[in-house]
Amino acid sequence: MALLQISEPGMAPAPHQRRLAVGIDLGTTNSLVAAVRNSVPEVLPDEAGRVLLPSVVRYLEKGGRRIGHEAKEQAATDPRNTIVSVKRFMGRGKAEVEGAANAPYEFVDAPGMVQIRTIDGVKSPVEVSAEILATLRYRAEDSLGDDLVGAVITVPAYFDEAQRQATKDAARLAGLNVLRLLNEPTAAAIAYGLDNGSEGLYAVYDLGGGTFDLSILKLTKGVFEVLAAGGDSALGGDDFDHALFGHVLAQAGIDVKTLAPEDVRLLLDRVRVLKEALSSAPQASLDVTLSGGAHLVQTISHDTFASLVEPLVQRTLTPTRKALRDAQVTSADIKGVVLVGGATRMPVIRDAVAKYFGQPPLVNLDPDQVVALGAAIQADLLAGNRGTGDDWLLLDVIPLSLGVETMGGLVEKIIPRNSTIPIARAQEFTTFKDGQTAMAIHVVQGERELVADCRSLARFELRGIPPMTAGAARIRVTYQVDADGLLSVFAREQLSGVEASVVVKPSYGLADDDIAKMLEDSFKTAEIDMRARALREAQVEAERMLEATQAALAADGELLDADERTQVDTLAAALRAVAQGDDTNAIEAATKALAEGTDEFAARRMDKSIKRALSGRRLDEI
């Protein structure tokens, strides 16, 4: 008789049967894949022993393609068909990347996410990223000798809903089961925390090729709690390359518009080598011949480079200050600063971090590999390979508040920013007008008080609400954010049970006003926003009062004598006169006057309703 194998949920049936899962760092410049072997996380190399896979894809005629090192070598000779730094285009519309610095690509005007025309047809960033992910998947399966049950893929903490969804789509296209989308700084903290048994407050400074993240984490007895996250989703090592690129052209008196695409790519590649050389030498030289025969020879000192990129360095410190403020800590409270991303190898970055935090940063793990290692540890745990000492908890956060539009274009925040995920929050709303049978629900993201100043994520309608007087219906709206940071919204009318929901998958074409800028604007305009909100709330209440009064007069106007009717009409006219103005106090005073002036009328209506309800009924029936 066959025996059933019974094991704990999510655990392997036998201790020696490990379920293979990997951590993937899908980077702007380079990507890596790592796995846990013999309880130790390690980065998996290719057949040549290289662990870094350049995030570059070159498309050839008739469906051919080259990925990684081979594609990177051809970037200068075939720039239009060789896609580099594709992560910067993930989840973005054409309007957002049209001005991408010195990009040699032909962007296609199509709805949704930006498309790039190549010799093999039009490609989306999702397709390009899928090629990179598939290459890493094959590397892992060859190295581990079996199929994967899934992968943890890291994303910048400041990736928005569209960018996260695009990353999951790319993984699915590559044949990968996504166990979790993990924020890059959190992955780095896992690698450091589990490796060193650290406890206390830590800052993770993550400067990659195209994005910057700063997270404040609290490590306590196996609990990884993200207290706050900040960053800039459009700032990375590429921007340092472009600053140096612009300086080289200016010194040579060359206008970038006169350069052929292959020369732009060649110069950018040489400038990147120059930047890397300046990380370990006081000066470095550039010697390059362009396609037209022009020969450029320049020597640049480290001091010159440092002055060129100082504005970029300062841009990383602005989100750093905000994250510390959000976490309600100071730089002096930070026990250690973890550096993540190849761009943090630059001395200008390490010096700036050391000066700001008053201590040298932690660099005992390779900044290029630490994110992949942390992701591998999380993947191994999620695959069910729990071992001794693996009892730890990860608490991540969302970067921006999630809210719903209410009457008057106001935002009611349901889940505030820096809330720990996964999370679900619910709030009850009601109807504004008598007999209202439907409600439009508008989901927004941002810190401002007015809908017009926030990002629209989704809209849906709840229909079938039973007709009732205004304010009688009870609609419960629930926001649910999963561990990947993706949002679902549910609405339910409590009496009838009708419900509607939406999984938020925002249009890839939405303009990203830069999440960091949204936060900055919210701080600068907080007082103005609150005044505007108070005004709109007063106007909405005035409108509700006027509509209710008008409906009452139409139904029971005979309960008032001529003088009383004149008084109510006068108060209503006074409120109507100020309701659309900008004097909040005047609107509130006029609303209060009308409410008090109709108190007796309301009492008479109540008496009439009671008499009508009791008419013709015996005492024992009541």
From Swiss-Prot:
The gene is hscA. GO terms for molecular function: ATP binding; ATP hydrolysis activity; ATP-dependent protein folding chaperone; unfolded protein binding. This is Chaperone protein HscA homolog. Keywords: ATP-binding, Chaperone, Nucleotide-binding. GO terms for biological process: iron-sulfur cluster assembly. It comes from Burkholderia lata (strain ATCC 17760 / DSM 23089 / LMG 22485 / NCIMB 9086 / R18194 / 383). Chaperone involved in the maturation of iron-sulfur cluster-containing proteins. Has a low intrinsic ATPase activity which is markedly stimulated by HscB. The lineage of its organism: Bacteria, Pseudomonadati, Pseudomonadota, Betaproteobacteria, Burkholderiales. PANTHER family: HEAT SHOCK PROTEIN 70KDA. Belongs to the heat shock protein 70 family. InterPro entries: ATPase_NBD, Heat_shock_70_CS, HscA_NBD, HSP70_C_sf, HSP70_peptide-bd_sf, Hsp_70_fam, ISC_FeS_clus_asmbl_HscA. SUPFAM superfamilies: Actin-like ATPase domain (SSF53067), Heat shock protein 70kD (HSP70), C-terminal subdomain (SSF100934), Heat shock protein 70kD (HSP70), peptide-binding domain (SSF100920).
